[in-house]
Amino acid sequence: MKMFSMLALFVIAADQFTKKLAVFFLRDMQQSITIIPDFFSFTYAENRGVAFGMEFAPPFVLLMLTGAIVLGVLVFVARSRNRTPIFLSAFGLIAGGGIGNMIDRIASGRVTDFIYFDLYKGELFGHWVSLWPIFNVADSAITIGACMLVLFYNRIFPDTEETRHAG
């Protein structure tokens, strides 16, 4: 459990620290910082929705949904007997990222985003599109944790003799 807690706290701290830097250097100084021209930059954005800026519910509902998911992850990890590093890492990343974004929603009603990969900007099926959203450290942690759950599913949730005969 210590690994889970430490990783979640690290993600929260890194997320909040980098968002403070983004507010100061990108929003307050009104600039975008190009790292790799036409590919990677730090660009300030505020997101009232969820992934990819989708706004499917009022801010209060999104806050409650985020809280319920984080609480669900915390309860699941606490009740599970699985203490493997990969299990704790995946769920620690997801919980830390969820809490990091939840802090923003509580403080300002929106999430600060600033990491931007310009993979494609142009016309697609007659509409102007930008194919990659601006995101943050918390979003990255959630995505990495979710990918770990998919990629290492059999190691995280081993198929034991008991579970095979339980159904």
From Swiss-Prot:
GO biological process, one term: proteolysis
Localization, UniProt: Cell inner membrane
Family (UniProt): Belongs to the peptidase A8 family.
PANTHER family assigned: LIPOPROTEIN SIGNAL PEPTIDASE (PTHR33695:SF1)
Catalytic activity reported: Release of signal peptides from bacterial membrane prolipoproteins. Hydrolyzes -Xaa-Yaa-Zaa-|-(S,diacylglyceryl)Cys-, in which Xaa is hydrophobic (preferably Leu), and Yaa (Ala or Ser) and Zaa (Gly or Ala) have small, neutral side chains
Entry keyword Ion transport: no
Species this chain originates from: Chlorobium luteolum (strain DSM 273 / BCRC 81028 / 2530)
GO MF annotations in UniProt: aspartic-type endopeptidase activity
Gene: lspA
Function, in words: This protein specifically catalyzes the removal of signal peptides from prolipoproteins.
Taxonomy, superkingdom: Bacteria
Name recorded for this polypeptide: Lipoprotein signal peptidase
Transmembrane feature ranges: 56-76, 84-104, 132-152
Enzyme Commission number(s) of this protein: 3.4.23.36
